[in-house]
A protein has these predicted regions:
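Short hydrophobic alpha-helical runs that function as membrane-insertion/retention elements
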Residues: 192-197, 214-217
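Short coil/turn connectors at secondary-structure junctions
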Residues: 1, 18, 26-28, 87-91, ...
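Long, charged alpha-helical interface segments
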Residues: 66, 245-253, 258-288
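Thiamine diphosphate
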Residues: 1, 6, 204-258, 262-264
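Mobile "lid/hinge" segments at catalytic clefts and subdomain interfaces of large enzymes
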Residues: 1-52, 208, 240-244
């Protein structure tokens, strides 16, 4: 700040207050005095801020109130825990082709203003991903109607009908920034599992924390077996355990089936996250 003041007074960016002088009104050459001040504030670093409110000694009865009409803030509800049953009758929401980063899954830009409102920001879910079946973005088939619509709209339709869905992806799915919304949005819109050729590590962990199944093909060529109208059944999710593959059955529109083996990297604690519905759910259960 002292240098800024000296430069401003002299009107020169190259002014050196140690060696240079200023010309007074009477023509006298003068130097600026060396600035002086207290090394430490006399009253310490405590700032009396009228905006500060001390927390309640007992926070058990404190409620955070958010305007229900706000489009930027929304209280989060805990995700539902696993019911202990195999996931059956799931629909393929999208089979993403090629690169699918966290920005393809949950775009930034103007969407960032909705970061505090999970339902609103979920309207950007996977809108940048390329659908392998038509090579278009944000255009997927709603198996309930046969019509094509935006990815979030189809996901919402499945969720409203009580139909689970899965996302299929390519190599290094979820690369890029560690964007938590890229895992929270599919979870919120009823996606139960993400099955890919390979994951970006942080996104895989984020899926686990939100109580989702992050799975990889045991045989990457099985990616090509998954068809647009497939219905997916998990055959042995009730035996979910560390190091044990999961078996998925893909039932095609003509009634034929393909059985696909999926790998995972879940340890015992992370399986606990899945069963509880999320890592936060499990922490809350343990605290109570």
């Amino acid at each position: 700040p002292e240098m800024v003041a000296a430069v401003a007074i002299s009107g020169r960016l190259d002014f050196n207050p140690i060696t240079d002088t200023l010309t007074a009104e009477n023509g006298e050459q003068v130097k600026l005095s060396e600035p002086k001040g207290s090394e430490l504030p006399s009253k310490g670093f405590d700032v009396e801020d009228n905006g500060y409110q001390a927390p309640s000694e007992d926070g058990s009865s404190v409620q955070v109130k958010v305007n229900p009409d706000s489009d930027r803030l929304q209280l989060l509800e805990p995700f539902e825990p696993w019911d202990g049953q195999n996931i059956t009758g799931a629909k393929v929401l999208i089979k993403a082709f090629g690169k699918c980063t966290t920005d393809h899954i949950s775009m930034a830009g103007p969407w960032l203003k909705y970061r505090g409102h999970l339902d609103n920001i979920s309207n950007n879910m996977l809108i940048g991903a390329v659908n392998a079946y038509n090579m278009e973005t944000n255009s997927v088939k709603n198996q309930l109607t046969g019509e094509y619509d935006a990815v979030p709209a189809v996901a919402r339709a499945y969720k409203a009908a009580g139909v689970p869905s899965i996302v299929v992806g390519d190599q290094n799915y979820g690369e890029g920034s560690s964007r938590e919304h890229a895992a929270m949005e599919p979870r919120h819109l009823g996606v139960k599992a993400v099955l890919v050729k390979s994951f970006a590590r942080i996104h895989e962990t984020n899926l686990k924390k939100q109580g989702m199944l992050g799975l990889t093909f045991a045989n990457e060529a099985d990616y090509d077996k998954i068809l647009e109208d497939d219905t997916v059944n998990f055959l042995d999710l009730d035996q979910f355990a560390p190091g044990r593959q999961l078996t998925l059955e893909f039932v095609h529109a003509d009634g034929s089936k393909d059985t696909i083996m999926a790998n995972h990297t879940y340890n015992a604690q992370q399986i606990g996250w899945f069963k509880a519905g999320s890592a936060l759910n499990l922490i809350a259960l343990q605290e109570n």
